[in-house]
């Protein structure tokens, strides 16, 4: 047994991130990921070791020996798959290859992670990859030990899928534009679990000297681009990617607000400090193994729900309209049939400043689609599982004294959810 107490301890006194093992849960069917993210953020930048089949809901299995690349969004601990957007992979050597031949072996003793940071040595291209993140943007640092045709694969077709056919057909449209030699922007629409639109801006700290577009299969619409750089062995390439649901301008605003320069160590430290601030809210006594178990679970609980609204509060809602969140932030990734029992009660205790935002997000989505989210993702509805557990989440928040939302609006969407038939609610009409 171990003791537990909430604290107001200054984060500088103890580094609680030392007790987080981001690889826990990443074995077969644990469906967690080891990469870098911020609490409740849009971005989760993490390695991909596979993408096809239920085993790869998070795109990573600890025992795998090949890394496909690094994607910028991930689901954490779910039993369904989606996201896995914008795969990038540093490569060297022959540029024109089959789309799946840029993957690399990696030694497990050269892979490491801590909250907000991930690193690995990629054996085949001879590159050290490092990842960190802000809430809406990822920042990568690649050190090319071998600079022969130093390049980056940008794969916009990629995404976790149930089978090979879906993997090669999930992208419905893909538009890209090189705004200058260092900036790529784009818009991708895809459909795996939910219909998703995302916009992005990708910037490099040095100019692209050549691009190669790989051939696409008949069912593919997502582009695969090889961007090549003039580099010497030992030099670093920095790349940052910001995303938005609203448009390229939204992605640019997110990048400018959060990662305006190329200070990798600064972003990494800010990510560490934010995680430590949250983790320091609970102090436990016990063995190091018990602390690792506890703080890793605490960490995983704070990865979602995810703020998908831009830094200025705008987001794409369930009707594909661009609107501004009522309280400044809109959250999605609500696996409510899982989280209503323990996670949401936990949030009311440990992150009370987030609770009103969660409730307002549920209410806003309900007012658009006609009923409370069942399993909300990327601002849309997946219609996954039965019942509607958002009711208890809102009721609990109100019962515990949270008043940062309109109680009458909340009651009306609860009533509408429970008493009105909605043809969009799959095959379980309430009569």
List each model region and its residues.
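C-terminal motif of bacterial Sec signal peptides marking the signal peptidase cleavage site
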Residues: 2-3
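Accessory carbohydrate-recognition regions in carbohydrate-active enzymes
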Residues: 9-392, 398-431
């Amino acid at each position: 047994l171990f003791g537990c107490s909430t604290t107001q301890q200054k984060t500088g006194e103890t580094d609680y991130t030392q007790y987080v093992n981001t690889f826990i849960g990443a074995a077969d069917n644990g469906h967690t990921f080891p990469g870098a993210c911020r609490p409740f953020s849009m971005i989760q930048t993490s390695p991909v070791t596979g993408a096809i089949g239920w085993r790869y809901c998070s795109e990573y299995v600890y025992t795998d020996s090949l890394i496909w690349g690094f994607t910028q969004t991930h689901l954490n601990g779910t039993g369904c798959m989606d996201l896995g957007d914008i795969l990038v992979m540093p490569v060297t050597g022959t540029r024109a290859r089959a789309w799946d031949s840029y993957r690399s072996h990696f030694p497990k003793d050269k892979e490491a992670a801590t909250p907000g940071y991930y690193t690995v040595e990629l054996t085949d291209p001879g590159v050290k990859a490092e990842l960190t993140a802000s809430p809406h943007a990822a920042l990568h640092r690649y050190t090319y030990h071998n600079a022969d045709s130093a390049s980056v694969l940008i794969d916009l077709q990629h995404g976790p899928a149930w089978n090979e056919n879906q993997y090669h057909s999930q992208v419905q449209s893909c538009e890209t534009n090189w705004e200058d030699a260092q900036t790529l922007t784009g818009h991708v629409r895809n459909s795996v679990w939910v219909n998703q639109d995302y916009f992005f801006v990708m910037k490099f700290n040095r100019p692209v000297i050549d691009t190669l577009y790989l051939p696409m299969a008949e069912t593919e619409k997502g582009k695969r681009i090889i961007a090549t750089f003039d580099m010497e062995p030992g030099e670093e390439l920095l790349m940052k990617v910001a995303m938005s649901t609203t448009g390229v301008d939204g992605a640019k605003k997110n990048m400018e607000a959060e990662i305006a320069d190329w200070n990798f160590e600064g972003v990494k430290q800010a990510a560490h400090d934010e995680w430590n601030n949250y983790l320091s809210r609970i102090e436990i006594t016990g063995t190091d193994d018990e602390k690792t178990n506890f703080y890793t679970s605490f960490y995983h609980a704070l990865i979602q729900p995810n703020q998908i609204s831009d830094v200025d509060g705008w987001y794409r809602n369930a009707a594909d309209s661009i609107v501004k969140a009522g309280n400044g932030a809109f959250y999605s990734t609500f696996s409510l049939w899982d989280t209503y029992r323990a996670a949401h009660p936990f949030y009311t205790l440990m992150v009370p400043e987030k609770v009103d935002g969660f409730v307002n997000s549920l209410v806003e989505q309900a007012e658009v689609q006609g009923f409370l989210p069942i399993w909300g993702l990327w601002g849309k509805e997946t219609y996954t599982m039965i019942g509607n557990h958002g009711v208890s989440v809102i009721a609990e928040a109100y019962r515990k004294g949270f008043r940062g939302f309109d109680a009458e609006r909340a009651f009306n969407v609860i009533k509408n959810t429970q008493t009105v038939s909605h043809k969009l609610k799959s095959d379980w009409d309430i009569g």
